A protein has these predicted regions:
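Cleavable N-terminal signal peptides of Sec/SRP-targeted secreted and luminal proteins
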Residues: 1-8
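Metal-dependent phosphoesterase/phosphodiesterase active-site architecture
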Residues: 8-44, 49-61, 67-73, 80-82, ...
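N-terminal active-site segment of His-dependent metallophosphoesterases
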Residues: 15, 19, 25-32, 37-44, ...
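Hydrophobic core positions of the immunoglobulin-like beta-sandwich fold
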Residues: 88-89
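Residue-level marker for buried hydrophobic side chains located in beta-strands
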Residues: 132-134, 173-175, 209, 292, ...
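Stable alpha-helical elements in mature extracytoplasmic
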Residues: 142-150, 175-176, 190-197, 219, ...
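Short, conserved loop/helix-junction motifs that constitute active-site signature segments
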Residues: 198-204, 457-459
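Active-site HxH/HxHxD metal-binding segment of metal-dependent hydrolases
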Residues: 204-213
Length: 575
């Protein structure tokens, strides 16, 4: 079977470009094309600007060349691919270009595609506004309906005529991790098929990415090889930023905290320092909106379920986050269920902090599981399974040695950077559902001038969204529709967290289906952005819409607000 799979590519097609996709370059006037072949071939592009109406030109009069690299898969047959990368430069802002990629000498070309060059700030202001598709966790299987609707977003309802039918302009597709399930499966052939499946979308609009846990195989090699993001040679596509009109888009590597075999604490320190400097450098007059994406979320829509022991002791929701904050009860040090990792962490903190730890007899309240705590506070951890379950502090010798090298830095509070620099929106995947938060910081809902369910006016904290319902074989398609609605109202989520505003597909099980959906973010102006969420289960029905409105940007503590209510009572939970 393995040999049969390896021979499915015929000799005549081995030089044909496959999985063509775009990404933004480091400069505003660039567009990067990436594709693969099964045999070594040239890296050529022929392209030309469209006519006055954007239609196809009479010929593709311009030529460009790029680089090719050999990629040997780590699977049992060491299958070979050639990854081709070409960058078009000096593109006219907002102009539509038509292009083909392939090998000019062999005459092996892809079909003809088009793309729109990045626009100037003035062009975005004139309209149409910047629109970004946001989704994560999309697999080769289970994603047919999602891919169909994404294709319609790009090409209009007549998907058979993807050249001439164009929906309202979509400027980018942003996917925050978990591709194909998995890119390396079947000696990389699952990844090949997935990239081909995404080509009707990603060959027309830039596909900007961040890595998830399903890319972890062999040190994230398939992710690093198949995609090319800005500054990819420095970071292997794991963290970068790019300006697109009014938006400063930042990708970061949430997986660095959970894979000690691939990323050490020195790496996390570099990424953390880079993010701090990058966010500080943003000109919030030129690019008022700061949007961040990664794979693992910082928050949960529901409190962690109580263990039997916790329920018997009075219902205190005790999480490993208690140990991170240094709050503990001496009498409970050796209690059953507290992992040796946590006990070791306690000793480590005592040594690091001079033996000064805050004591607290009883910890109460709701917190998320350790995985979210680790993501929010930036604490290097280890998970027993790739899906993130059973996570705990990573106290292995390699980490501790690395911590000493960076002055005993044992946590990298990424959420603090969001608050410090005024990150407006952060979206993630990992959980196969859709939910959004109220503006939140340090597990507290932070009001602005007016915060309602659908309108966040002058918020004082980052809004977090999980858009991990991209469709994959691990998702359940039940007989009944997903649970949808306001988190805290009657009939909403059991044990809903106070920061959870709206959800779809979180409370699944029995006969209920999970949600299969994607988001579209529109930046109407420097003072308003709107998120719309569409369900592929309901024939593209819009299931949620909400907006952030603020005329003041930058660090939340330094923003000029028109008023300051400052009370949780200002949160409205009715439409």
């Amino acid at each position: 079977l393995t040999l049969a799979l390896a021979s499915t590519v015929s000799a005549g097609k081995s030089h044909d470009p496959k999985g063509v996709h775009l990404s933004f370059g480091s400069r505003d006037d660039e567009m990067v094309m990436t594709w693969t072949t099964r045999k070594d071939a040239g890296t050529d592009v022929r392209y030309g600007p469209g006519d006055a109406g954007g239609g196809a030109p009479a010929d593709l009069a311009f030529n460009a060349t790029g680089d090719v690299r050999k990629f040997v898969d780590y699977g049992e047959i060491s299958s070979v691919r050639y990854v081709h990368v070409a960058t078009l430069e000096s593109l006219a802002p907002g102009r539509r270009y038509w292009y083909q990629v392939g090998d000019a000498k062999l005459g092996r070309w892809s079909k003809i595609f088009w793309f729109n060059a990045r626009r100037t700030q003035e062009q975005y202001t004139e309209g149409p506004p910047l629109r970004i598709i946001a989704l994560c966790d999309i697999g080769l299987k289970g994603s047919d309906s999602i891919v169909e609707f994404l294709t319609k977003e790009i090409h209009g309802n007549d998907v058979d005529d993807e050249i001439n039918n164009v929906n309202p302009r979509v400027d980018a597709l942003v996917q925050c991790g978990d591709f194909a399930y998995d890119l390396d499966d079947q000696n990389g052939q699952v990844g090949d098929k997935f990239m081909a499946k995404m080509e009707p979308i990603a060959a027309y609009v830039p596909w900007m990415t961040s890595a998830g846990n399903h890319e972890a195989s062999h040190n994230f090699t398939h992710y690093a090889e198949r995609f090319v993001m800005p500054d990819s040679r420095k970071t292997n596509n794991h963290y970068y930023s790019v300006d697109v009109g009014p938006v400063h888009l930042v990708a970061y590597n949430t997986e660095a905290l959970f894979w000690p075999g691939s990323f050490g604490v020195e790496y996390i320190q570099r990424m953390y320092d880079w993010m701090d400097a990058d966010l500080a450098s943003v000109d919030r007059v030129k690019t008022p909106w700061v949007i961040v994406h990664g794979h693992r979320p910082m928050y949960c829509p529901q409190y962690r379920e109580l263990t039997a022991e916790e329920a018997a002791s009075g219902g205190s929701r005790r999480t490993l986050g208690e140990y991170v904050s240094g709050e503990y009860d001496d009498e409970e040090e050796e209690e059953e269920g507290v992992s040796f990792m946590m006990r070791g962490f306690r000793k480590y903190l005592r040594g690091t902090l001079g033996g000064k730890l805050k004591k607290k007899k009883k910890w109460r309240g709701g917190m998320c599981p350790w995985e979210q705590e680790s993501s929010r506070k930036g604490i290097p951890s280890f998970c027993e399974a790739a899906d993130g379950t059973s996570c705990a502090f990573n106290e292995n010798a390699v980490f501790l040695e690395g911590a000493r090298k960076v002055n005993y830095a044992w946590k990298f509070p990424i959420e603090d950077l969001f608050q410090k620099h005024g990150v407006d929106l952060a979206f993630y995947g990992h959980e196969h559902e859709y939910w959004r938060s109220f503006p939140v910081y340090d597990e507290k809902v932070v009001n602005g001038t007016e915060i309602t369910l659908d309108r966040y006016f002058e918020p004082k904290g980052t809004v977090h969204v999980v858009t991990g319902a991209g469709g994959n074989a691990n998702m359940d398609l039940g007989d009944d529709p997903p649970s949808r609605g306001v988190c805290q109202l009657k009939g909403g989520l059991k044990d809903a967290s106070p920061w959870c505003a709206f959800q779809s597909g979180v409370d699944h099980g029995d006969s209920r289906s999970q949600e299969f959906a994607y988001g579209v973010v529109t930046f109407e102006s420097a003072s308003k952005m709107t998120w719309e969420h569409f369900s592929a289960l309901d024939d593209g029905k819009r299931i949620d819409t909400w907006s952030i409105e603020t005329a003041s940007h930058g660090p939340f503590d330094a923003r000029a607000y028109s008023a300051d209510l400052g009370s949780a009572d200002a949160i409205a939970t009715e439409r």
